[in-house]
A protein has these predicted regions:
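Phosphodiester-processing cores and adjacent nucleic acid-binding clamps
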Residues: 1-155
Length: 155
């Protein structure tokens, strides 16, 4: 999930959420439970977004996970992406069944297509794997860059 501040009060709430997650919810990385998040929440100041690839919808669809987040305190916006990957259509259908509150987005991880190998090397180092066998699901496209986004949007 991604939390966006809508104004200065939202920014202040986001700092409180982040501080709580870092100090009281830390377990290898900052985290917060839904009950606590709900206690900080105000739709006037904050907006919740559900990413396309790194989300419960994606994991439930592709890996048969059974995550059901408690989102009764807000109406999140769901990000949609189309990167010509085989599962994009499956996840898009699931998202559209969940909500009409969607926004087309594009994940960007590096600047140019030629930078993909450097990005993959970085991911392999973090994953403790090698370029010969990266063991990174769906890391098959060099289209997650500014260059590809410009091509799609500027003709």
């Amino acid at each position: 999930m991604v939390i966006f501040p809508k104004n200065i009060d939202g920014y202040k709430k986001l700092i409180k959420i982040s501080t709580f997650a870092s100090r009281r919810g830390f377990y290898y990385y900052p985290r917060i439970d839904y009950k606590t998040l709900k206690s900080f929440w105000n739709d006037k100041d904050l907006k919740l977004a559900i990413p396309f690839y790194d989300s419960y919808v994606f994991n439930n669809t592709l890996y048969s996970n059974l995550c059901v987040p408690e989102l009764d305190f807000t109406e999140p916006v769901y990000f949609l992406e189309d990167n010509d990957l085989p599962f994009d259509e499956l996840v898009t259908k699931k998202v559209n069944n969940l909500s009409k509150n969607t926004q087309k987005t594009q994940s960007i991880y590096y600047k140019n297509k030629k930078d993909f190998k450097a990005y993959l090397t970085y991911k392999c180092i973090n994953n403790r794997s090698s370029l010969d066998k990266p063991e990174l699901d769906h890391m098959t496209s060099n289209e997650f860059c500014v260059e590809s986004w410009k091509e799609k949007n500027n003709g």
